[in-house]
Amino acid sequence: MEDRSKYIAEESEDEEDEEQEEKEKKGGASTSTETEEDQEDIPSVIVPTINIREERLVDLAQTPAFLCLNELHTSGKLPGTRMAELKAKYTLLHDTVVSTQESEVQLLENAKRFTEQIQQQQVRLQEADDFPNVFTTEVSKLREQLLKYQNEYTAVQEREYHTQYRLNSLTEEKSLVLKEFEKIPKPGEIEKKTKLLKESTEELRKEVIQKRLEIKNLREDVVSKQKQLMKEQKELEELMDYQVGLKDDVVHHQSVPVQITKEIEKLTRRKIETEKKNVVLEFELKELSDSLKKLENKVSALAEERDDTIKEVEGKRTLLEVKEREYGQLLKLLELTKENEASSLAERGILDINLRNCLMDKQNYHDELSRKQREKERDFRNLKKTELLLKVSLDALSQAQALNQRLLLEMEAIPKEDLLLPEQRKELHKEVDLAKRNLAQQRSLSEAEAKLVEQQIAEENKLLKEQETMREVLFNLGRMTQIKMEEKEQKAKDFLKSQRRYCDIIKEIKSKKLEIRLYRKRKREIHRRLKEFAGLYDAIRNERNKFVNLLHKAYQKVNEIKERLKMSLNELEILRSSAVSQERKLQNAMLKHSNNVTIRESMQNDVCKITAKLQEMKEKKEAQLTSMDRLASMITVIEEEMVQLRKKYEKAVQRRNESGVQLIEREEEVCIFYEKMNIQDKVKLHQDIEIHILEEKIRFLKLKVAEKQRQICVTQKLVPIKKSLDANLAVVQIQFSQCADRIKALEKCFVNPDCQGRVRFIPGKDLTEEEMIKKLDMLELQLAKKEEKLLEKDFIYEQVSQLTNRLKTKTQACKMDTLLLAKKMNSYQKKIKDVTQEMMALVAELSMKQALTIELQKEVREKEEFIFSCSSRIEKGLPLNREIEKDWLKVLRDEEMYAFATAEKTREYIDTDYRQLPNGVYTTAEQRPNAYIPETDATLPLPKPYGALAPFKPSEPGANRRHIRKPIIKPIEI
């Protein structure tokens, strides 16, 4: 706004100056001399005096538009993408304004130059008009008046143009000012907004101050509470440790009498149980002996029945095997007859097809033989023709050789004097010239005769020159005729070649047509054969399907027989297993009896030991009762201390709860502020996510496009490989047919029951019944031992888990302390590392600086020695060294080169900045090349224009003009 006000003030001052100038012009129009002087001063075109701001020097980041956009973006009214678009548009507009300003400045300079030229021309005209200054006539007065009125008219026109220009600029400024004025809010609204903002800021400031004070107070309270809590926690931990120790002692002492009583009860129970077991075992022994007798009787009966059943099963099995063999043989015979029938039918069909094919092949071979005989006759005729041509060419060759020999003889017969004629002619010319000179130099001749002689000499020279030119023309014409003859011969040869090619091509076309007919016939035959083979294939496939169905039925029957066999075997195994189980039961009963006897003896020994232990336990019980009384008194004291500690703990919990409530209230207030911040962050994140989604969509679409293009390329590449793929398909079909034949052969081998490789027996020996029983007993004993070990491990695990739980509680209590210590240690280690790194860096810098100082000291010493030597030489009157002179010359040369380089850079920069195109526009782009240098050795490397389609070189002549011989370009002699 300040710039705009300055701009308007300057314009008003310019307008006042112009009005004063106009008044002065009107006042001085009374006299003719004054008008003429004014006309000389006033230019014909007045340049508009508008104070245009220099846009090139403006910083875009500090413009009001950019500042306004940044404010809107920070306030959240404008998104980032929209801001970037508006900034880009503004920069484009700014660039256009700068370019228009530059063009305007150039136009103004041109206008100034033209006005100066017009003024000079007017001065010259006036001087020409004022030529007769002495004489003053009516014509001169009228001319002066006319000039005055013309000048006034031009001044009025200029003023009108100037005012119109000023008016347009002012209207534009007015529109801009109005737009800005509309954007500017009203003072009342601004005051209201400012008041509201001030009030809100004051309220927020007060609230912030209050909150800060409250936070400070709360922090102080929290610090004090934390200190108290730390003290109380330490006291509580000490008391808890003491309490845990006491509890452990109490538990340890309490568990001793309880364990003793439990052990006594266990022993009494065991005693009673063993007595009961003895009674039960005796009763079971009697029952087992009775059952053993019954089982023995049953076993004998079952053994007899088993023998009978085994005999019956073996007889039936032999019968079944015989029947199965007969059935299998019959099936084989049936299958063989069917196979023979099918093979004979297939052979008959194949023989029919082969017979037809042989007939067709015979016909084809006959046709080929007739065709080849015709070709042979044609070739024989061609051979005769070529032999005739060869004879003619040989005769022509002999004639040409004779002619050549005759010409050579004639050449030898020509005298050598004819060859020396040009030299003799030159010598005669020289003698004539000498005679002419001598004649001209003779004094006895008169002037007229001398002139005649000179004229004749000049005419003679002219005639000689014409003769030489004519001779050269004749020689050139001879050469041209020779070249034309050669071209004619070449064209005739080319014509003959093309005729021969034409004939050959016609012959090839005919032969190709015949081949095409033959291939078509073959194709028809192949199609016919394929149809026949297809019929055969269908018949074979139907037969194969029948055989497959029969095979399936046979498989079903075999499976049924196998199932029956399995059922019978299972029944046999069930009977065997029942017999084995009964034998095992008997053995187990015997083992139990022997175990019971041993257990009874061991129990008697245990009873004796328990009585001895009971006496010892009674003595221990009395000693432990005394210790129990002492521990009970200690427990009462500890319980009283525990009650006091619980009261202290409850007080500390109340304090903690109060401070927690206060902290929650403050946290809620802080959360409100954080929520506001989070809302803004979420909005920003949402927009970023949308942008990211759009970018991903674009990337995905690009990938799709690339994939489609790749697929297109792949399909385009696969098109030319079609023939090779068809060939591969044929090979694969052949392999498929071979595989099908192999599968049929394998199926036949699998169906055949007499095949040796059909069954595979498992190696090794089968165990006997006794070995199996022993193995089972061993496994049972191992299982019992493992169960005992597992029980022992479970008991140990329970005791260890109790101890570990106690240790775990203690370790969890000490975890926080160790964590804090570890954190402190880590922080201290980090600090130490940082300090060491800084120390190392400083040491490295110091060493570098020391090395630099040493180098500089060396340089200083060298310079001092050099200066000392120079001063000593100057004192002695000796000249300086040549090396110094060379160095000085190098310095001067470097300065000159640097100055030249800077001047060239500035010139290039000016050229690039102010490069003018033919249409008057300035550009910084490099000029496009309009010509190229041809890569030829014969001609000079002169630039040639590109032509209509730059930057492409003109193309060579097409294929239809290749038979024409290119003219040989003569090299330019410089």
Curated annotation (Swiss-Prot):
Localization per Swiss-Prot or TrEMBL: Cytoplasm, Cytoskeleton, Microtubule organizing center, Centrosome, Centriole; Cell projection, Cilium, Flagellum; Cytoplasm, Cytoskeleton, Flagellum axoneme; Cytoplasm, Cytoskeleton, Cilium basal body
Protein's name in the database: Coiled-coil domain-containing protein 146
Coiled coil: 105-160, 195-340, 421-474, 512-660, 687-712, 767-848
GO CC annotations, alphabetized: axoneme; centriole; centrosome; ciliary basal body; cytoskeleton; midbody; sperm flagellum; sperm head-tail coupling apparatus
Record-listed Phosphoserine modification sites: S12
Function: Essential for sperm flagellum biogenesis and male fertility.
Molecular function via GO: protein-containing complex binding
Region (Disordered): 1-44
This protein's UniProt keywords: Cell projection, Cilium, Coiled coil, Cytoplasm, Cytoskeleton, Differentiation, Flagellum, Phosphoprotein, Spermatogenesis
Gene: Ccdc146
Species per Swiss-Prot/TrEMBL record: Rattus norvegicus
Comp. bias regions, Acidic residues: 10-21
Self-association state and partner proteins as the record states: Interacts with CCDC38 and CCDC42. Interacts with intraflagellar transport proteins IFT20 and IFT88.
Principal location: cytoplasm
One of the GO biological process terms: cell morphogenesis
